[in-house]
């Protein structure tokens, strides 16, 4: 059984995405692409906060409440949190981070990495 992802996996995967930097803000690690935030490791680093369109976010939380949740202060923003110990494996974490990266990345990076963060063809 694969080990569940932890904060170090979040950091390693996020920083492997193109043009990503880590910056401490609000006393926590944040990850940015071309200066735009796409992931944070809040509180005890047991969950990761990522960009997610509100409609999609609400569906995720309803479908998998043990995995996804919305922090009160983020409710009005298009962000969702994923509990690291509820993720299936590192692959799922990679998909979540890459999807958030796509939402923040500028067009030049999306054009340079057209498949990054998109579902792979089966």
List each language-model region with its residue ranges:
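Charge-dense, helix-prone N-terminal extensions
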Residues: 1-122
């Amino acid at each position: 059984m694969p080990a569940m992802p932890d904060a170090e996996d979040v950091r390693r995967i996020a920083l492997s995405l193109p043009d990503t930097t880590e910056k401490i803000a609000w006393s926590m690690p944040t990850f940015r692409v071309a200066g735009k935030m796409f992931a944070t490791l809040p509180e005890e680093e047991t969950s990761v906060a990522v960009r997610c369109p509100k409609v999609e976010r609400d569906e995720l939380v309803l479908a998998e409440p043990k995995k996804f949740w919305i922090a009160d202060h983020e409710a009005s923003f298009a962000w969702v949190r994923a509990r690291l110990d509820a993720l299936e494996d590192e692959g799922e974490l990679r998909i979540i981070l890459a999807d958030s990266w796509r939402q923040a990345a500028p067009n030049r990076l999306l054009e340079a990495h057209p498949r990054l963060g998109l579902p792979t063809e089966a």
